[in-house]
């Protein structure tokens, strides 16, 4: 069974504890959204899973096989990873950037199917009209969509996106998240996404991972996890929580009255 097991994972940066003995079991076909205040280890968790940050303790395993038992290259082949704030000033067209998702090394040769797959990814995200544009000419939001298309081509078992909608307008936020959810189910990915928009997280998450103060504060469905006491404690703002007809929570911050 394609299960990602995080067992007592601890991370620190200097004297700062980022994660303290975090344990989670993540299943395929589900979107796991990581939320929490700034500086609570959300990005660090993704980087540790990808092997960019060395853990102080604990273990990460896939299908019962520890990351320690694999070479770093083989472990990373399991992932499609889109970090936040990628700075790319490449003199390449959009279609060329996307098709790089199929390359494990620059010595590999591309097949016609790779080009077709890149075109399909752009079409699915509604940005096929950008295919021949140079990447450097695009807006920040357009670049985010292009990089998401590139990650789609990696055919991963584990998909990780760090704030993938931060530069997107409302239409493209919905388009990216809807496509991500659809592909997660169809391809049976184990998907992890860092989001700051709690209502977007509530709408698209199968499971929420709530981090704060180095600890796992909650893990479960949005309907079970997102309540006013938790959000007010973590974010230090008053909120009201309502639910739509399907039980999905909706959060509204309450403006503090002056004086």
Predicted regions and their residues:
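The feature captures the beta-strand-to-loop junction immediately N-terminal to the Walker
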Residues: 35-37
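Catalytic Walker B motif of ABC-type/P-loop ATPase nucleotide-binding domains
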Residues: 159-163
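Conserved ABC transporter NBD signature motif
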Residues: 55-66, 75
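Conserved ABC ATPase signature
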Residues: 134-138, 142
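Conserved ABC ATPase "signature" region
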Residues: 99, 112-130, 155
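ABC ATPase nucleotide-binding domains
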Residues: 234-259
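Helix-to-loop junction immediately C-terminal to a conserved catalytic motif
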Residues: 50
